[in-house]
Amino acid sequence: MPLPGRLSRRRFLSGLSVLAPWSSHVPVRAITKGPKFHWFGYYDKRQFDPTGRYVLGMEVDFEHRSPRPEDRIRLGMIDLQDSDRWIPLAETSAWNWQQGCMLQWLPGSDREVIYNDRQGDRYVSVILDVRSGRKRTLPAPIYALSPDGRWAVTTDFRRLAHTRPGYGYNGIPDPNRDAPAPEDAGIWHVDLRTGQTRLIISIAQIARTPSPPPHPQLDWTGATHWFNHLLVSPDGRRFIFLHRWKGGAAGNRFFTRMFTADPDGKNLHLVDGFGGVSHFIWRDARHILSWANRPPLGGKFYLFEDQSDRVEPVGPDVMTRDGHCSYLPGNRWILNDTYPDKERQQHLYLYDTATGRRVPLATFYSPPEYAGEWRCDLHPRFSPDGRFVTVDSAHEGGRQIYLVDLRPVIG
């Protein structure tokens, strides 16, 4: 492959396309195109390689329905220095609309990526060398990687397929479908070198874990429980997971508690137990930014200190809606988005923690058919140097990946 280099402003602008309906305060361009549909998925995965040149993506032939077991998607990477050329990499049948197949670069590597797949009656993960094409298959799927790329934590994608459609994989039935809180399912630790896998936290264990004061003791009698949204801390010493439940006393909506734990599942800490915690990101090894609905302020973004009760609101007057948040390198700027407003507009913006100012970046129209399981959230992901952001958007008639230039704002 050619030697990587910095993406110049001239090269960026040369690829700009006419976008509608949308508005932008900074340069935006499509880096994928039809007739196939392209997206990446979640906001907390490494989409850019360490040089910022190669951007991972997924390609699919259809939209507006649930994936079927036989549906396969194509994985590839986009060369930002070669007219956004699509480079095919692999295929998989373990995927969903919100998080794809967990495709991401292995931390620190400029040649190895990892993704989930289905082989026979089990889900697996595959480490692929994008230069040589060599593959190594691990006996379990992955959810979140450690920062050194040596291990991962994962949960049961079979269970997610029916408890939270859009986040699990279709193709293998959940053996515990009728079990409200199984003992043999939960969170597994996966050694990415040896493939060794062990259950470290069971769903049953957490369903038996009460919420200490000041958190209320919510009633989940008769409910079905599951885990979702795992993320390892920047120093690899802790990880977050969400405990969710619905049904029974909880009714038809789901409730959520946020926990942290050590990589072996020990030293559990309840971060938020008020039932309405949502998207989150580690700011550093000790602090977590998350949307939560908690007294007395209600729905806001809050900064939690891990393994303590300290919490404070962040941007309460300007970050007023839930979104997919992350910190740009240096932690001054929070990158965030919104769900569609009443005009179906999704807003991409920065929040300056130094001044408390919200800086609009771009607005993308979300057609009404993009809703529920197959909605197309922006899910902003930043480049290693924090100067570029990618988003998924369907404003041009089908989901594609767009590159946003932050340099006019952050320099």
Please give the residue ranges for each predicted region.
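Surface-exposed loop and turn segments in beta-propeller and other repeat-based domains
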Residues: 32-37, 90-96, 198-221, 361-372
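Short, conserved, GDST-rich strand-edge loop motifs in beta-rich repeat architectures
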Residues: 58-71, 157-183, 242-254, 337-343
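Asp-box/WD-like beta-propeller blade repeats and closely related beta-sheet repeat scaffolds
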Residues: 100-102, 116-186, 201-215
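Blade-loop segments of beta-propeller domains
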Residues: 42, 70-113
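N-terminal secretory signal peptides and thylakoid transit peptides that target proteins
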Residues: 1-18
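Blade-terminus and WD-like Trp-Asp/Gly-His loop motifs, strongest in beta-propeller folds
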Residues: 46-54, 101-112, 144-151, 231-238, ...
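Conserved blade-ending motifs and adjacent loop-strand segments that build the rim/top face
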Residues: 315-324, 357-379
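Loop/turn-rich, solvent-exposed surfaces of beta-rich toroidal or solenoidal domains
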Residues: 316-355
